Each structure stands twice: as C-alpha cells, then as structure tokens.
A protein has these predicted regions:
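N-terminal, polar/charged subdomain of small-to-medium soluble alpha/beta proteins
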Residues: 1-61, 67-110
Length: 110
C-alpha cells in the first residue's frame, strides 16, 4: 500500500495532494499494465485500487495485491506494478502547501 507523502517535491510540509484522472482511459491503462506484468512475472490474480481526489498526508493512495504460486514472484510483480503506476499511469497531481496549489510535471522518486 502506498501513502501520501508528508512533504512537497521541494521538501515543504504538504497540506494535501490532489489527483485527477481521465475516467475510462486511466482504468484501461492500469489494467493493461497489470496484465503485462502478470504475464511477465507469472502471477495469478492482481488487484489495484487507486484513489483520486484530495488526499491528506499519510492517507492511503494506492493498494496493489498480487497472487502467485511463490512469494517472490508476487513481491516482484507488486513492486514493478507500483513503479509502473507511479511513472506511467495517467494521473494529474497537484500539491497543496500554504493554501497554494502547484501542478506537478513529473512524479516523485522512490
């Protein structure tokens, strides 16, 4: 499970993170990512729940669950999917700090 970070990209205290998406397109792209990684890691069922809207620091933002015959395969698949979501899922993110919103041009590193 991923949570909203407590600071902005430049290290200031975060008030909130706002996520927007294009309904339909976002879900299709996440499904395609999950299916590709499911095959690559020989995983079984995959569940992805990703929140949108305004979220406070520390709140859950994404849940990835992977079933596989072996624990290692499930862990590798889940880690790869979290990275894919972070860098390639079509979300627009705005950080709120001191009452000001700033749209992010890129995602945060690990």
């Amino acid at each position: 499970m991923g949570r909203v970070r407590p600071t902005t990209m430049d290290g200031r205290p975060l008030e909130a993170l706002e996520l927007e998406h294009f309904p339909g397109l976002c879900e299709r792209q996440i499904t395609a990512m999950a299916q590709r990684l499911q095959q690559q890691h020989r995983a079984g069922a995959i569940l992805v729940l990703h929140r949108v809207g305004r979220l406070a620091p520390g709140e859950p933002i994404v849940l990835v669950a992977v079933e596989a015959g072996r624990r290692g395969a499930a862990q590798r698949c889940a880690a790869a999917l979290l990275e894919e979501l972070k860098h390639h899922a079509p979300f627009w993110k705005r950080e709120w700090c001191a009452g000001q919103g700033t749209w992010l041009a890129e995602n945060t590193p690990l």
